[in-house]
């Protein structure tokens, strides 16, 4: 499913729509990985689940940073 790690600068370069789409893809992939783990007992790639979770967290963190930046800008004037 492509490269594993999304770098923060790659995420910041994405539009909000692209980030939401990527987040949706990652959540679907995480669900597939967890399902295969529950069926077979062992995931195909154990490190992949951890990396998917980290990528989801990176995207959510970037979204929150953007949200806080907009709030600060409106408070300043």
UniProtKB/Swiss-Prot annotation:
The keyword Metal-binding does not apply. The keyword Metal-binding does not apply. GO terms for cellular component: ribonucleoprotein complex; ribosome. It holds the Pfam family Ribosomal_L29. GO terms for biological process: translation. Keywords: Ribonucleoprotein, Ribosomal protein. InterPro entries: Ribosomal_uL29 (IPR001854), Ribosomal_uL29_CS (IPR018254), Ribosomal_uL29_sf (IPR036049). One of its GO terms (molecular function) is structural constituent of ribosome. NCBIfam families: L29 (TIGR00012). Belongs to the universal ribosomal protein uL29 family. This is Large ribosomal subunit protein uL29. It comes from Methanopyrus kandleri (strain AV19 / DSM 6324 / JCM 9639 / NBRC 100938). The lineage of its organism: Archaea, Methanobacteriati, Methanobacteriota, Methanomada group, Methanopyri.
